[in-house]
Amino acid sequence: MIIFYYIYEIFIILPFGLILTILAGLATSLGCMCGFGKQMGYWPGVIWGKCFCYLCLSPYKVIGREKIDKKTSYIFVANHQGAFDIFLLYAGLGHSFRWMLRKGIKKLPIVGFACDKAGQIWVDERGSSGLIHTVRQALQTLNGGTSMVVFPEGTRTKTGHLNRFKKGAFTLAAMLRMPVVPVTIEGPYQVLPKGSFLVRPHRMTITIHDPLPAVTKEEGTEQGVQRLLTESQRVIAESLNEPVMQ
């Protein structure tokens, strides 16, 4: 069976996936340059993600989509199971969003240019001044129902288990006064774990949890950040039937 997967990946997934990526990148770039950034910064990615899920023989289901309002902007925080998380979230989240990305992605042909034109939010790692720049960029993009997706673990899991969350996404949410929505992803680790190049078909699930209220001035930034981080980690860990980190 593994030999079949290798053959299928080489002759079907790789060539068709490359074509899909180029088309999605071009559609995003041209659409955004023509003034349709809000729509074309998102919808080509949705089609791209759905096509990849079907191409890789990995169906998915979404639980809890009714908990979010399409007209509200959120910070979605999800566990990071693998590279396939990107396809799954585009395909199934059902809410316009942008990514928080490292600037190194700008160097990728077609994809980097498309991400820039789509208004993806680039992480500025120059300390406090960099955070302010990131906040300003986010303020320009995250409005009218456009949200952001962040992986607070910071990197893909090597074991399939949840890692401890970092504060960055929650600090940004507190500064922007935006609600946070924990999202549990299951299945992408089995499809394409970190360090593997072999895609293995597997069922996937997105579980959208109840939104956590935005940090208020009365609550204070430090206390609010800790609340959002702790509650998000707890909700996702319990959904995965894993111990809650203290």
Task: Tell where the protein language model's regions lie, with residue ranges.
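Generic preference for hydrophobic
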Residues: 62, 76, 99-100, 206-208
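Short gly/ser/thr-rich secondary-structure transition/capping motifs
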Residues: 56-63, 131-132, 188-190
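Membrane-interfacial terminal anchoring regions of lipid-handling membrane enzymes
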Residues: 1-33, 39, 43, 66-69, ...
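Catalytic core of membrane glycerolipid acyltransferases/transacylases, capturing the structured
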Residues: 21-43, 47, 54-56, 70-128
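Short acidic-hydrophobic, aromatic-tinged amphipathic segments that line or gate anion-handling sites
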Residues: 62, 121-124, 214
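Non-catalytic C-terminal accessory region of glycerolipid acyltransferases
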Residues: 4-7, 132-246
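Residue-level "edge-of-site" marker
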Residues: 66, 128, 186
